[in-house]
């Protein structure tokens, strides 16, 4: 397994920046009383889009091996925040405050661990399929739907979401709240993403994608367990795109 030096440099810079962002967001929560719901989404955007931005400067060859190492790195990153570690390292404790929503306790890390693993398990076959059919850029539709749409859903819902609905969560009987305004962010973002990648569809495929993908991804986000949006968005959106591109 030959991993390029550019890959390691890219990820060293990425995780250094990610640690800094988490730390400063944690300080904002502790000293400025900024809502964790907002800082958590700042972290979310950083995790999704910093790698892409860094790749413009530090590019590396993609492979199944690098994708697997990405998953390992994400799990190691989360492991820094388990209680025995963060309680002994003040910096990590501050960073943990940037994504530890009070309503998620004591399952904050459990949900993040399981969501990361489930998301990667869904993405691996999707990446393999789209790459084998020379359609790899199409997967960006569901990544944008999750990264931008779901990323905006919570802060928009908190600020503007007067009409809300409840959803369940794994490993608990508690109910959690989502907003129609937040779900609208997922719908609009997915619609725009399809428009941006329209060149990969035939006219009939494009019409089918526009009419079905935003609706079903929005429903996937709405009915997914609390904090478990990503794997459901990827699974539903990916399966639907494969169906459209393969059968139409």
What do these predicted regions represent?
Residues 72-74:
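Aromatic-rich transmembrane-lumenal/periplasmic boundary elements in polytopic membrane proteins
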Residues 18-22:
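Glycine/aspartate-rich loop-and-adjacent alpha/beta segment that forms the canonical ThDP
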Residues 202, 206-207:
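Short alpha-helical packing/oligomerization segments
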Residues 1-9, 24-67, 79-192, 197, ...:
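Interhelical loop and helix-boundary elements at the membrane-water interface
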């Amino acid at each position: 397994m030959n991993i390029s030096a550019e890959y390691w440099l890219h990820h060293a810079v990425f995780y250094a920046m990610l640690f800094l962002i988490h730390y400063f967001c944690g300080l904002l929560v502790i000293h400025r009383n900024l809502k964790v719901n907002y800082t958590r989404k700042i972290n979310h955007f950083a995790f999704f889009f910093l790698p892409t931005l860094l790749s413009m400067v530090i590019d590396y060859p993609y492979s199944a091996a690098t994708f697997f190492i990405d998953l390992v790195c994400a799990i190691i990153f989360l492991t820094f925040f388990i209680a025995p570690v963060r309680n002994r390292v003040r910096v990590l404790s501050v960073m943990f405050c940037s994504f530890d929503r009070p309503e998620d306790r004591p399952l904050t890390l459990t949900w993040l661990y399981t969501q990361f693993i489930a998301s990667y398990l869904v993405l691996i076959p999707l990446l393999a399929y789209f790459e084998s059919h020379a359609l790899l850029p199409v997967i960006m539709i569901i990544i944008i739907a999750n990264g931008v749409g779901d990323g905006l859903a919570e802060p928009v819902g908190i600020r503007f979401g007067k009409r809300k609905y409840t959803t369940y969560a794994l490993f608990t009987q508690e109910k959690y709240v989502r907003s129609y305004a937040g779900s609208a962010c997922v719908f609009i973002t997915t619609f725009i993403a399809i428009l941006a990648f329209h060149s990969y569809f035939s006219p009939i495929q494009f019409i089918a994608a526009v009419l079905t993908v935003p609706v079903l991804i929005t429903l996937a986000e709405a009915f997914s367990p609390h904090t478990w949006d990503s794997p459901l968005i990827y699974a539903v959106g990916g399966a639907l795109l494969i169906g459209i591109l393969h059968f139409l």
